[in-house]
Structure formats: structure tokens, C-alpha cells
From Swiss-Prot:
Residues 1-65 form the Disintegrin domain. A motif (Cell attachment site) lies at residues 42-44. Heterodimer with subunit alpha; disulfide-linked. Disulfide bonds join 6-29, 20-26, 25-50, 38-57. It is found in: Secreted. This is Disintegrin EC6 subunit beta. Potently inhibits adhesion of alpha-4/beta-1 (ITGA4/ITGB1) and alpha-9/beta-1 (ITGA9/ITGB1) integrins to VCAM1, and adhesion of alpha-5/beta-1 (ITGA5/ITGB1) integrin to fibronectin. Has a much less effect on alpha-IIb/beta-3 (ITGA2B/ITGB3) integrin. Also potently inhibits neutrophil migration across TNF-alpha-activated human umbilical endothelial cells. One of its GO terms (molecular function) is toxin activity. Its main location: secreted. The lineage of its organism: Eukaryota, Metazoa, Chordata, Craniata, Vertebrata. Belongs to the venom metalloproteinase (M12B) family. P-II subfamily. P-IIe sub-subfamily. One of its GO terms (cellular component) is extracellular region.
Length: 69
């Protein structure tokens, strides 16, 4: 078994001082900055961008549509 550099193997949570262990918006144990593209635009859809507060990549809207639709 290898030890994950970001995750405490006992608690299964990020180690002290680390913010995340995995995800498209997590890099080197830290959440990437707001606006970082985590899924490039395709067709009529906009880029998906990191929020700066989560390691998940939230879906962005279709071009011209508000994000709460």
C-alpha cells in the first residue's frame, strides 16, 4: 500500500494543512483558484470552471443561458 501525500490513512480526510486529496479542482493537495478551467468548452457549452472552494468541477451553462437553469 502506498501512502497518499494529501490524505490521512486513519481518518480518510485531508492531512493537516492540506485542502483536498483528489478531484479535477485539486492540485498537489490544494484547491486550485477560482476560474481555473476543469472541463474545456465543447459544442454549445461553456468551459466548466473551478469555484476556488471545492475540489469538484461544477457544470457551467449552455452558451447564453444563466447558470441557475
Amino acid at each position: 500500500n502506498s501512502v497518499h501525500p494529501c490524505c490521512d490513512p486513519v481518518t480518510c480526510k485531508p492531512k493537516r494543512g492540506k485542502h483536498c486529496a483528489s478531484g479535477p479542482c485539486c492540485e498537489n493537495c490544494y484547491i486550485v483558484g477560482v476560474g481555473t478551467v476543469c472541463n474545456p468548452a465543447r459544442g454549445d457549452w461553456n468551459d466548466d470552471n473551478c469555484t476556488g472552494v471545492s475540489s469538484d468541477c461544477p457544470p457551467n451553462p449552455w452558451n447564453g443561458k444563466p447558470s441557475d437553469n
